[in-house]
Amino acid sequence: MRLSELFREVEFDGSIKNDADINLVTDDSRLVRPSSLFVCIRHRSFDGHTAALDALASGAAAVVTQDRLGLENEFRVADSRSAYARLCAALCNHPERKLRLIGVTGTNGKTTVTTLIRNILSDSGTKTLLTGTVCNRLGDENLPSGLTTPKPPELYSLLSRAVSQGCKACVMEASSQALAQGRLEGIDFDAAVFTNITRDHLDYHGTFENYISAKKKLFEHSALSIVNLDDPRANEIIAASKGKIITFSTVLDCADYTAKNISLLSDCVHFELVSKGHIEHIEFASPGLFSVSNAMAAAVCAINLGIEPKDAAQSLAKSKSVCGRLERVECSAPYSVIIDYAHTPDGLEQVLRALRPSCRGKLIVLFGCGGDRDRTKRPLMGAAACKYADKIIITSDNPRSEDPIKIIGDILKGTDKKRRDLFVEPDRRKAIALALKTAEPGDTVLLAGKGHEKYQLIGGEKLPLDERETVRKILGLPHDTGRKKQ
């Protein structure tokens, strides 16, 4: 594609002297080759402007800058991140305009809600692309996932592939980092869903206000906003919304959709979805009140995109729990072992509360906190565990460059250190062995924090760690053949 075509919808200072043919738009100077367009972006640890000359030397046809560098083949823009996303979209012939786009954002529940919406659309005959934390799923094909929301080159490559393979919709998790970094700039969504917001990612955003401001961006460019009215900050999302607003709630009758006659069972939830006199019975195979909210978010979104309520209900009834979200490990033990991605204070609290009713014995929780991430949530995680668990084992999560012992020390600040049922074991495998060794019949063991992840980030290494297989190995069971698709 010619430079003049790429810049058709991107304002810039300068003139196109050489209307070169471009086949790659990148912000990574190491990938530059002839016929590339290099975009200079200020990252936290590196300013792409310092690599502009290297990019030109490697054959880049031109560079896009935010700062004036005085280079011959320089196109200066007001916001290079925004330009990057729009240029990648143009290079792929705007596949986002050929799909029905649904974005889901919030601290907790994004993966479950996007998966459920994808299931409902697929069951209704709409081939759908799913992008998110666990995997990218094109129709029935699972593709590897790196970031929760892909960077522009990967995102538009996925969208383009989806269009070419007959997809009519895309459901994506919209992370706060992606929204803050402008990865979704230029996309007009058909629907945006807000699940909830609690403290997370403050290591990146700095303040909670910056965090919620990033989330709001999704609703400024959506024709339809689906908002969880149970969240204390829901009105801020509503105020930021530019399109039609639809609300849902498990408790408030003023919402457009409410949940009535809620039954929280040991392994599922039942409730009636009520709106304007219409009642639809909903079942979803995941416990806890948050599962009601997740199912409501998916159903309300689908219904307002034209899906019949009964069809949405039928799809939810046959949907299974998402990988690493309240996932039960099949291990033939006299106690239950559950794996969940809960890695925030609120997330851990919600999962522990969901498991309590079905726990006939002690509720045992094993967890840690990520290194090089928000340190202020660590004692809050410890406090949540102390409030809801009978036995606590504090261990490592992804310590990254931090000392695991220091991270554990931060967690312990929020606990009652006099508790005789609180244990510390920095080695996660040994901690899992301790949890299983001390579990008794009827107990529930929650392995929190890793969820779908099958690795640990320690130092500069990515080391294999599949908690399912770790449990099975400790118990002397054979290797699992694999988890069934949702």
Functional labels for PLM-detected ranges:
Residues 15-25, 84-87, 150-153, 172-179, ...:
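Short gly/ser/thr-rich secondary-structure transition/capping motifs
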Residues 1-86, 90, 232, 258-263, ...:
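N-terminal leader/targeting and accessory segments in enzymes
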Residues 1-13, 31-37, 47, 242, ...:
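ATP-dependent carboxylate-amine ligase
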Residues 67-69, 133-134, 176, 197, ...:
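Short, ordered loop/turn segments at secondary-structure junctions
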Residues 22, 34-35, 60, 71-72, ...:
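Short, well-ordered alpha-helix to beta-strand connector turns
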Residues 71-72, 137-142, 199-204, 373, ...:
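A short acidic, helix-capping loop that chelates divalent metal ions and anchors anionic groups
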Residues 7, 84-229, 233-244, 296, ...:
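Phosphate-binding loop of NTP-binding sites
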Residues 9, 65-71, 165, 180, ...:
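Acidic, Mg2+-coordinating active-site environments of NTP-dependent enzymes
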